[in-house]
Amino acid sequence: MDIRGRKMKKPPACVQCRKRKIGCDRVKPICGNCMKHNKMDCFYPDVPGQYVPSSSSSSNTRQVANGPYLNSYYASRRVSKETAALLQKNPELASLEQIREYNTRLQLLNAQNQLNNRSSAANATLNQQHTQYIPKSVPSLESKPVTSANESSTPLNWVQGPAIFHMLTSPYTQDEIINHEMNFLKGRLLELQEITGKKITGVNLDLKQDSSAQMQSSHSNRNQEEFLTIKKRKLSEDGVTDGDGKPIPESERRPHLNEFKDLDPQFLDTNKVFNVFNSAISEEGRNRLWLLPKNINKSSIFQIQYLIERDPFLFKFFNDLNILIETQFNGPLHDLVASRNSIERNSGISQILKFPSQSITQTLINKYLSTITETNSILPILKPKRLLPIVEQLFPSNTINKPNSKDFETIFQVFSVTNDQLLNLGFITLCLLILFESLNSTVLIPLRDDEHLQLFNVLFNYLPLLKSNLTTLRFEIEKRSMCNIETLRFISLWKYYQFVMDTSSSSSFVIDYDEDMHMACLLSLNHETQNQSHILTWNFIFKNYCWRHLFLGQLPLLMSEPFTNSTPIIDPLLNNDFELIDFEVNLMKYLQSKDQQLSIDKIIQLIKLLKNKNIEVSQGCLTTPSIINNIMDSLIYRNSMLYLNFYLLLQFETLKNYAKFNEILEDFLELSRETLFFVFSNLANIKFAGHEFTFINKSIVVLQTLVLMLLALYQRSFDSSKRTNDANEISEQTDIHSNNDNSKRIKNKNVIHLIINKIAMLLSDYTKNCKKQNKLIENLIIKIKTISKYIKNLEENKVTTSADSNYSINNGFSGISAEQLIKLNHELSKISESLIKTDFYEQRKNSTVSNGVLGAAAPVDSDANSDTFGLTKENFNEVFEAIRS
């Protein structure tokens, strides 16, 4: 029984073996038994491999029997029966024919099985197509004498190889393809006859019609109707005629065509096409905006630079800031650029590795073990306990006195250490760096006694040297071309540290070359193995590789297909969140697709499925390591949801579908409230004490994205209230309803401004309890202060200008009704009160941002320097760095 439910008889035994009831080897023309007993009358009663109907699949058999492949098969068998007598007289030719026949049939059956074993999704696409078996390689032809049936020796081309076939999907059957090809050849032959003047007799050059005249007629009529429809639409959409076919004056004609409907009348409705990824800002406008980095990855759809180029309101903020710096801060800008270039020219790769003394290093490693208690689950490739004897072995011989100090430090010359020692020093470096980030990011592990405080200060002082060590180690590993499992473990741990501790919210400053994934594939860790240690290493690399790309909205291309990863999952953390990662990878496949138009309805459906998948995975996290690990999954999910919902807002705003815009806006505000609570609650959870380093920086990046999206909503609310107010002033009569409507719009934008300021206050309070400043948090506070000054400047000038004169701005807030404005205000107030109670915030309204943020002690929303958005010559460098981060 084959996979189609057909019973297939074995090739029958010869008549002599059947009479004697012995096993037959079915060799033609004479089987082994007949040859052994010298019986030359060996013959076979039936054709081998003939299909017979089965009781369970008679319908399937009838369908298959009518197919183009078996029809051609039976036709060839009729020819072979006529020559069977001749072939039996020639053993060599008969055996060759039999081998060719069996090979051809086997290749066809194998190809058919491969087609049937495809996934259901692929089958759904192929159901309406026909598979053509085209030879993918030409077998070698050798001129060799073959004895023919009449005993004469004739040189023939002997095929040296089986008939190899390749599957090619086509919307036509084989009969249709042959008919089209024959018509083409006949047409070329007619042209040759016309050119040469020679006529070929005995050849029918009439163009062959389709096998079904009725079908041909219906196709012809349908094609003619579609052609007329397309032609009429082209004239109409080009502005030559109207819908009734009447000509339109040339001055009123439209200069463009709807290319999709011209090509396919049944193309998807343009109101259902998701095309917001097409940049809304002109290329000239984007080129003027030098303030933001230009070397962004164009496939990073969840990146703020990518969003700015598609939202004219958000673009306006950065464009105004760009113009301000060009006109009023040109001098400080040139000084900053010159200083950067000087630092880059003087920077180099050190050939020395510096560490604290042996005793301090061992104490710090023990501190790591007591602080990061879940290190075995979260960082399975880092073994701190194994580093203690290595420190004891390597450090004593390289310890020296510090100049002008009684303290000791350990120095290694790079050229004098072996490859194994180099990797061990790399693990020690990363262990100390992760320990610093762990102690600095938590506010729940205070350093009360002097001994621990002094130890932390020593670690902080060595921070630049440890980062320099990391750069030197990476350069030396590449220089020595080291490629083994231990090197891979170090590279993967370094990539993890780079991902979780990156102080930039953009991928523009650090190019990810996926060194860990490429080396792992080179060492074949992505294929099934029995080595448990190798499997754990691969699971760790796979998870972090997907995290890095999914957070930025990129497709993890190297792992986007199932055949690239056959290694089993034994890491319980990856096993828990694999389904969510796999779903997000498939989502990126669809969003990054270049060969199809994206559907708005499908994206909305995928968003709902993503939400349900995240809930399922989160509910499965029951242990502390799984909960900590799931925080990164949740951050990737929330970051994706924020961007997708905001892109939908832009899409419906462009289509002027205000009902859908308001619906998505409600979902976005609810998601924003949940995200703010999620981020700040994780930073104050005692369960995560010492492990905040795994998610703190990505949490701040999500907060920064949300703040800029809130700014874009504020600009829309401000623009709609300003235009409504201007319309009321121009109108001779203003009713109470319009005034109330405008007051609600003003109230909404004020609440959005209040939410942004409250986020800054919470971040400021968090930094007060940190041991040292977090650069990413500091930059976000600076951004919020700049945004606050920008908002005050808008309120004072009350000017609404377009960010791009070539682009007509639609404002989704202008289509919100009065009832919806009340509901919107309620949602915004819930977000505001969930952060800080407004009464308490008003008491602290004039408090200053701690730790010298912006280089001044100005209040968060003070009126100082609002005309320059808070920029001064003193704080220009800090603000410029924060805006570009």
UniProtKB/Swiss-Prot annotation:
Keywords (A to Z) from UniProt: Chromatin regulator, DNA-binding, Metal-binding, Nucleus, Phosphoprotein, Transcription, Transcription regulation, Zinc
Domain of life: Eukaryota
DNA-binding region (UniProt annotation): 14-42
Record-linked SMART domains: GAL4 (SM00066)
Cellular component annotations (GO), alphabetically ordered: chromatin; nucleus; RSC-type complex
Modified positions (Phosphoserine) in chain numbering: 95, 236
Disulfide links within the chain: none
Entry GO MF terms: DNA-binding transcription factor activity, RNA polymerase II-specific; sequence-specific DNA binding; zinc ion binding
GO BP, sorted A to Z: chromatin remodeling; nucleosome disassembly; positive regulation of transcription by RNA polymerase II; regulation of DNA-templated transcription; regulation of nuclear cell cycle DNA replication; transcription elongation by RNA polymerase II
Compartment list: Nucleus
InterPro entries membership: OAF3, Zn2-C6_fun-type_DNA-bd_sf, Zn2Cys6_DnaBD
Major subcellular location class: nucleus
Assembly notes: Forms a heteromer with RSC30. Interacts with LDB7 and NPL6. Component of the two forms of the RSC complex composed of at least either RSC1 or RSC2, and ARP7, ARP9, LDB7, NPL6, RSC3, RSC30, RSC4, RSC58, RSC6, RSC8, RSC9, SFH1, STH1, HTL1 and probably RTT102. The complexes interact with histone and histone variant components of centromeric chromatin. Component of a fungal-specific module (HTL1-LDB7-NPL6-RSC3-RSC30) within the RSC complex.
Main function: Component of the chromatin structure-remodeling complex (RSC), which is involved in transcription regulation and nucleosome positioning. RSC is responsible for the transfer of a histone octamer from a nucleosome core particle to naked DNA. The reaction requires ATP and involves an activated RSC-nucleosome intermediate. Remodeling reaction also involves DNA translocation, DNA twist and conformational change.
Further details from the record: Present with 1750 molecules/cell in log phase SD medium.
PANTHER family linked: CHROMATIN STRUCTURE-REMODELING COMPLEX PROTEIN RSC3-RELATED, OLEATE-ACTIVATED TRANSCRIPTION FACTOR 1-RELATED
Name used for this protein in its record: Chromatin structure-remodeling complex protein RSC3
